[in-house]
């Protein structure tokens, strides 16, 4: 049967043969000399073309919508009819290219079992109408009894018909194309090597069509998987990701098509005669194979046979090996993917506990070894990696005093993440100083009532002894000097004498008389007397005891330095009305600027109302101060892998007509790639000349065409969110306590106000902190595992090679599929190297995984410790390893803040029971106050240098508050206002000076505010004088004089006793002698 179909400017000949099936030929119309041009979207051809075995017929039809013809293909555009009739489908494979149904004889096709689709569906019975390649074979499909295949070939409908004409859930799902050919067998060793390389390309696939591909601990449900493959005649197919193909031309009888000009295809018998008897005309290649008839007989009466412009036999290059497979294709299979077991998330650590040690803690984990841990005490933190069940973690030396809350966050080797809290009582006050005559002893003499006087006496005695030794040494040096200088003086005297003698002789020649001689003799005698006086001169004795009082007096004079401390602000913008009972209901509006305090401290905004003895406080307690990334535009980075493929076509075969087609551009796709890659993906195409001639498997000696394409893909779907940091700004974690007692935690970043809570909004104003090396850092987060890293990256829109962000996508979905309309890249990231038959690629892409592993959080960069943050303002927080100060304050805006104030004055009395801690330090001194109050109220303590406010409960209770002092000995009267009741309390106690905390390996601290005392001041001489003699200039003067005189008297007493002892010893020796 023969049909001729006209369409637009193309004419298509479709032949059905009883035996061998002929190809589809697309040629220009016979009535026109103009060649038919097909727009080069998938390929470029002219004059004579073939929709060959790997042409993706449906793709060709999709890009040539003007075509209205008959094609032996089960799918395609809706307006396409199908040929031959449906009752002949058993002979036509929609999977294989049209007119090559004889290839079915090369394959073993088994009947479908239990399902007629790749996805679950009903079981079909009846005739098979197309096949589907599976991982280990080929399966035929059909419609169930009482059903027939629809014209489109994609649905089965009931023969009796329904209202819709279709049956639900009967859609046949199939995607793919296959080319089959005679195979060159390969040994089992080569097959195993190909299999191993395939497994390395698909490490996350567990099973394919129910057959084990990789061993997995956990796997997903089966899901569609589109993949290129080749059948090499062994137990299963080899699936491939990155491979190359080349086509070699080997002519046979079915590679030629015979037709009569002006009529159409020759009949089967005529074509068979042409190919066997050589009685027809043909092109050079046909004549070489079958022979041709020569003569002037009209061309219309004879068949003309021409070589079909097809790619030839395919050779696949994969894993460094070249194979001529039985079948090569691209189709959909069902695969299960590896599913990793979810990691154990944050929880409690069974068998974990803390032990407090000097300067740190010991963390014990009984169930598993410790992998890593971060322990924070106050605003000092320390991190450690152990691998043991008992780990000692040290903080900054000398940083912790008194009762301190401990926060632990860590992970065990078995994967368990944990967090828990505890507390330690570190030595406080003078108990923290446990050495004698050491550095701490010199800074805190008040802690040594007896030892300090002993130390002073020893110092004075050593001072006097040193001065005596010094004067004696100077005296000895003077005597030694006179011995050395005497010969020099004698030499100068002799020289002087000789010069005078010469002068006298000159004068004798000029003067006459004995008078001149006598005068010269007299002058010489006077000179001799002067010389004698010079020689007899002796240095005066120096009284060494005069220097000690002078030096000690200079050392004792100094000035004390003071530091700013925590203060509170009072607001008078209050309007009140009488409430129920003895309460006033007040509403206040305003703004206040509070000094920012250090972690663990509070800043208070104190509210009072006229006529009410009561007061309320709004408190801001700082829990942490860190540096946070102020993000600029974020983008998404895929875990990209470079891919490339190439196909070599001989000259005048397929798309390679007269060389590389001019319409093949960077966005073009070869016909061989049509189903193997996403047309919307990010890539770059090209065409280059390859080898030609018989040595390269081509009929034509002209250079062949190597169509190549390089692209990137995300095989594992891993996506990284990259957030470049425009700046690193201070960020605080604060606990806001309202006057009503309600508490809310906020995470304000510098300059960004918090949400309004009960009419109150807080803005943290922290100064920028300049740290070198942080400007190019970016937060890098893997969206699935939540892995965090901090590393240099490209800014959004920039693609500098060598940094994270060479490929940037605008959304998570576009990064998963790497779409060209949602991602940008530099095509030079994937290099391509052309060879004789194919092209190979190499990657310059920076591995985000490798960078993230190297710079994983926690990490230390530029003197800062970066760790994971769990608040909304940034994923990562930075803390200085050593003391680093910033300036900051809190701007509090309150509008309509409600206060309930009592009009009854409380009866409140108390006393200070203890004063301990440190002075000129970050934590301040701890003052214990015992109060008795007749009702709940607010107490306000005001001392000379500091003040604080705290809540008081009804009854007798003890309270501990922080106050800052700048001297060691505290003895002063402070004002106590408790519920309107005024009284005085006396503070007495000794405070210690804590040295500036020193960095310990693994420790770091949160940023603190420089407006709060930091411990950077050293004790002045006045601190010593206060510790020794008490406060007051008169006490200092009398004390210093008394010490000097007492030391002098003690010194003479000791010297007298020493001389007396020496005399007694001398007398005893004399008597014995």
Swiss-Prot record:
Disulfide bonds join 26-49, 143-156, 180-327, 206-216, 258-305, 266-303, 274-280, 287-292, 349-352, 356-424, 376-381, 563-604, 576-586, 629-725, 644-841, 650-698, 656-705, 660-687, 691-696, 778-793, 809-823, 908-978, 918-921, 943-974. Residues 475-535, 1058-1073 are cytoplasmic. Residues 20-453, 563-1036 are lumenal. Glycans are attached at residues 33, 63, 853, 914, 936. The keyword Metal-binding does not apply. The record marks 1071 as: Important for glycoprotein C and glycoprotein N subcellular location. Coiled coil: none annotated. The record marks 562-563 as: Cleavage. This is Envelopment polyprotein. It comes from Dabie bandavirus.
